[in-house]
């Protein structure tokens, strides 16, 4: 009897042990799913690389908001140009601010002027083109598209687009070389230098003094030094001449003024144009240069009455003008 009980107990123990082994193995085994989750959690996310715009912004510098946002970072000047400004016409005018004695030209006189516009060539390149038009056609005519495609405006400067402001989409370009260099926008051309008897520009003695931006214009002041052949002026005898220039960049109205044909009986300055038509003909027109005067009282103006303009023509008299001359200048 004892032998049977012992045999039965051993049988139960063997059965229990057989089933217990798999249970203990399951306890020690690692869950492959959990390991995968741990690996995903510990995996480092790739670091976001800074673009050139973000790297430059970290350097700080000064900032002005206006027609174009202007940044001055270390020794360089930058414009942030919005998409809306591409293709818009701007008038660039450069004048003398101060000149050497006996230079032959006076402060306030014009150095050059140009109508320009910005054009994006690709994601990395922007052009500054001169709007050089002497041929035109009625926009409603079929030939106007042919005139547009068959002609092209000169590129006066090329910018590298450094990057974009991700919030505003404005494109950042470096304008330092544009305003420190000699070109038709902000300095002298080779022909201009010959006329005023200036030699080559001295880069190490040429500086951008200030760039100030306003709602519809930007003002750039530069100090320039040129080599010079000895002449009658004391400055030229030193072998160099230094002068100060100011360049104004003014945004022109989006809707251009209605052109008016010249009449030889009235003394206006004019601009000559060749106008093409669908009839395979062309004619020479002269468009006068005039102020954009819009009558304040249009009904009275239509009746032939003298009325005031919406925007007055304003002349500024230099505060250095002798007081006894001022009344006569106003008259």
What does each of the following model-derived ranges do?
Residues 23-321, 327, 331:
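Auxiliary tRNA-acceptor-end handling modules of aminoacyl-tRNA synthetases
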């Amino acid at each position: 009897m004892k032998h049977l009980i012992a045999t039965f107990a051993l049988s139960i123990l063997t059965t229990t042990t057989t089933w217990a082994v798999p249970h203990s193995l399951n306890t020690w085994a690692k869950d492959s799913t959990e390991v995968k989750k741990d690996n995903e959690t510990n995996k480092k996310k790739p670091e976001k690389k800074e673009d050139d715009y973000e790297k430059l912004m970290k350097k700080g510098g000064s900032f002005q908001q206006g027609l174009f946002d202007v940044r001055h970072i270390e020794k360089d000047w930058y414009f942030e140009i919005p998409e809306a400004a591409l293709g818009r016409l701007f008038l660039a005018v450069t004048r003398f601010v101060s000149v050497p004695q006996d230079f032959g030209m006076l402060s306030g006189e014009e150095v050059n002027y140009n109508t320009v516009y910005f054009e994006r060539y690709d994601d990395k390149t922007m052009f500054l083109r001169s709007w050089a038009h002497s041929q035109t056609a009625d926009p409603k005519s079929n030939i106007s598209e042919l005139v547009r495609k068959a002609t092209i405006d000169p590129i006066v400067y090329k910018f590298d687009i450094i990057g974009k402001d991700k919030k505003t989409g404005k494109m950042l370009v470096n304008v330092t070389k544009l305003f420190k260099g000699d070109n038709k926008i902000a300095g002298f051309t080779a022909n201009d230098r010959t006329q005023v008897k200036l030699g080559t520009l001295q880069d190490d003695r040429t500086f951008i003094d200030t760039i100030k931006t306003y709602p519809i214009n930007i003002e750039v002041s530069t100090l320039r030094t040129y080599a010079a052949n000895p002449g009658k002026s004391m400055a030229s005898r030193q072998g160099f001449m230094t002068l100060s220039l100011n360049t104004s960049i003014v945004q022109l109205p989006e809707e251009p003024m209605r052109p008016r044909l010249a009449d030889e009986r009235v003394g206006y300055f004019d601009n000559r144009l060749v106008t093409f038509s669908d009839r395979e003909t062309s004619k020479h027109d002269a468009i006068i240069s005039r102020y954009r005067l819009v009558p304040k009282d249009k009904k009275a103006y239509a009746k032939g009455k003298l009325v005031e303009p919406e925007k007055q023509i304003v002349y500024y008299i230099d505060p250095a003008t002798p007081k006894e001359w001022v009344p006569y200048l106003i008259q």
